[in-house]
Amino acid sequence: MFCKKSLFFLLPLFFCACSSVVSVKINNVENSNLNNRHDDVPVTAIVYQLKDIKKFEEASDIDLATREEGVLGKDKLDSIKTQIAPKDNIIAVKVDEEEVPYVGILVLFANNTRKTTKIWAKTEDANGFGKNKYLKFEISKEGIKRIK
């Protein structure tokens, strides 16, 4: 009986002590990035692991793409640049929720007119539980958006 009671109290502490891994999933839908000849080409996505999002929000797309270290400074923990093919769904990065409070994504399109190119999310707002937590984003012809 004592073992059951102690297990009942210790199990939640164990789960709270374990840090959660958040997967950043990005889905690139068909015809999201048409070039001048109307070919569906891959997009380039840069996923930033951030301590704070203020500098990320204020920065221009060109500054982020060309001089991210100078623009983001110590707020940037890490970044990864990847190309995502049309109709592809990838896990761009897995981050520790306690170490990485924010994730920012910059998408570079062949034609940028009137598209949402930047987005960010708190890792604590990820869906799921434990090791199955995720932040899901979708790239379409309108730009990038978060899917809840």
Model-derived features: where do they sit?
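Post-signal-peptide N-terminal segment of Sec-exported extracytoplasmic proteins
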Residues: H38-G70
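Exposed aromatic-hydrophobic patches
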Residues: K87-D96
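Extracellular beta-sheet/turn segments enriched in Thr/Pro/Gly and aliphatic residues
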Residues: N31, A121-K148
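Sec-dependent N-terminal signal peptides
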Residues: S6-F15
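Positively charged n-region of N-terminal signal peptides that target proteins for export
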Residues: M1-K5
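A short, solvent-exposed beta-strand micro-motif common in secreted/extracellular proteins
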Residues: V100-N111
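Short amphipathic, basic-aromatic surface patches that mediate peripheral association
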Residues: I26-N35
